[in-house]
């Protein structure tokens, strides 16, 4: 099994921890020696009551859920792990603009993601993802689609 397939399969497992009833996204951030530095999935912030049904419904959920990519960044920061020169493997398409900026600023140099947005509400993210690709290209972050 090649590394890409290995880490994507781990991200697929990580996403299953999400309590989002409609969309599950996973992220695995890996160092230059193929060591796992951090993982993340879309979720409510730590300590927030995740049993409030209204927080699961669109558009309300967009105020409450954190994205997998940013959760992986925050998880690394909480334990003092540098993400400099790392690669992130996603179970989704391109990250949104907010996540793309976070990945760039945290030192990620490569993103491996699906060619197309796979969320049920992909239209909401199209414009953000188009801009994030421009940002990633200008900032020298390699994008590999699978």
Segments the model singles out, each with a brief description of its role:
Residues 1-146:
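Zinc-dependent deaminase catalytic domain
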